[in-house]
């Protein structure tokens, strides 16, 4: 019997900021450097399932060879003269849709933001697709053959200086790898791992192709890919940050924070063997007696150390993780309870997401995938009471096969400070960054939520999932929710408005984005739209207040809450790399089409149209046109 002591709190975002704060940058920890101005500009298109797709791409049956061949054929027909490579992260989702990803190449170098994703339906035909391939003139190969570009060390040093990264680069050398233009940069200090550099092409905002060094640096607070001009090593064309801001005695699943209940619950063996067949305390090779297992490893990191394996974590030979959480106590006095709570919430969310389709093939976070697809050795490193910062939390999502990292901080808006792990919405928000980054663009590409609107949706998905999970049996569409209310000790929460279906309480709409430039603000708009869709689906299908969905024979959740969560997750895998709001809306409609045959078009369109993302809504850089129209015939009543 294994027991954990946890608090089930579920509701805060990364790099959160109270309403009185200045807007947070892409990553506010780089003092004096605003990374927002280095965001990549999206250039993707998305062809949804309602549009005409060439019939010649149809194959019968959904075996791997067929769906991959179908996808290759579509790319070749769409771009007959383009060079590209098939990525290895293709898979069939549990909704029956196969996802295949390609990377454009020029002179055998990747075009790092040249992506093509193809979604193949159950019948073997193309369901939808997205792409951001470069279509302009291909540069001469002369620059490569004559090696008319700087060395990677120069690119690293410029990135360190220009972005003020805390890495010392004295006598640095570039060590070759098996790839002819990929290097490990040895001899630095201050980074978690040795920086890396790879020669690639990048499509610039004006549509030209530029040869760049992609410099990767992990300094704990920021895990950056910096695109440095390869010819001069004196210009940065873009930056991507991977970081988005037993018996257990815990606050159980669905309890958002200590303010909702008087005491914690004692839970015995809270895992589901279908979702965690190794339980939460084994990786298939060793059975642990501490907060470590296949899905995550939790420990304190009060001293902000870059390592984690030797950090303190509670240990119980009987796996009885019941620890005191004294009201008004100092954080250090309840560190065992804190680590246990974090371990519980992260594992419980892993299991729920697994049920909803985020499994090994889709790139989930597990040390051992047991041969079920995806890449191993990428559980989540879970740091409780991390000393790197205060009043925040963050999540780093590298590509599939590398561990993710969640850092939970103390919040100093009360005396004594409050520990963010006890507001489970914060943990869920952070973990959702990993979900959305692994699914959008495929498990091997963590660069697909780096533009303003896509990064905003990354924040919005976190708020949405945290809010959906904490709905109570008595809630109705008139119930409003805030984010971060407990840690900030503020009933209004940390967002500009509460999440509400009332336009008086929350007036945000699509064109509100025209006045925004920061991802958390934009994320509130997206989550507000999803909250409308959520309640439309609950009103139609009812609400399951249990911790797990039930499914019909087609694999469709039987209630509106879990159905909304399911189609939102499925849509992440359908949409293109760096989608805008319109494309992501269309992907949600497509997800419902693939899962239910489009039975919920009216509810989905009505939710989005209410907040300006109706049929005629258009995206333009810096200027968006709203629409409150619903397509004709979508909401016709049946006689």
Curated annotation (Swiss-Prot):
Question: Where is Zn(2+) bound in this sequence?
Answer: 429, 433
Pfam families referenced in this protein's UniProt entry, alphabetically: FTP, Peptidase_M36
Q: InterPro entries this protein is in?
A: FTP_domain, Fungal_virulence_M36, Peptidase_M36, Peptidase_M4/M1_CTD_sf
Q: Glycosylated where? A: 287, 320, 336, 368, 509
Which biological process annotations from GO are given for this protein? proteolysis
Tell me the cofactor note.
Binds 1 zinc ion per subunit.
Q: Which UniProt keywords apply?
A: Glycoprotein, Hydrolase, Metal-binding, Metalloprotease, Protease, Secreted, Signal, Zinc, Zymogen
- Cystine pairs annotated here are none
Its chief place of residence is secreted
* Cell division listed as a keyword: no
EC identifiers of the protein: 3.4.24.-
Question: In which compartments does the protein localize?
Answer: Secreted
Q: Which GO terms describe its molecular function?
A: metalloendopeptidase activity; zinc ion binding
Q: Please list the residues that make up the active site.
A: 430
Cofactors = Zn(2+)
- Signal peptide extent: 1-16
Query: Gene3D superfamilies, from UniProt?
Result: 3.10.170.10, Neutral Protease Domain 2
Positions annotated as propeptide: 17-245
Regarding protein family, the annotation reads: Belongs to the peptidase M36 family.
As for what it does, the entry says: Secreted metalloproteinase that allows assimilation of proteinaceous substrates.
Protein name per Swiss-Prot or TrEMBL: Extracellular metalloproteinase mep
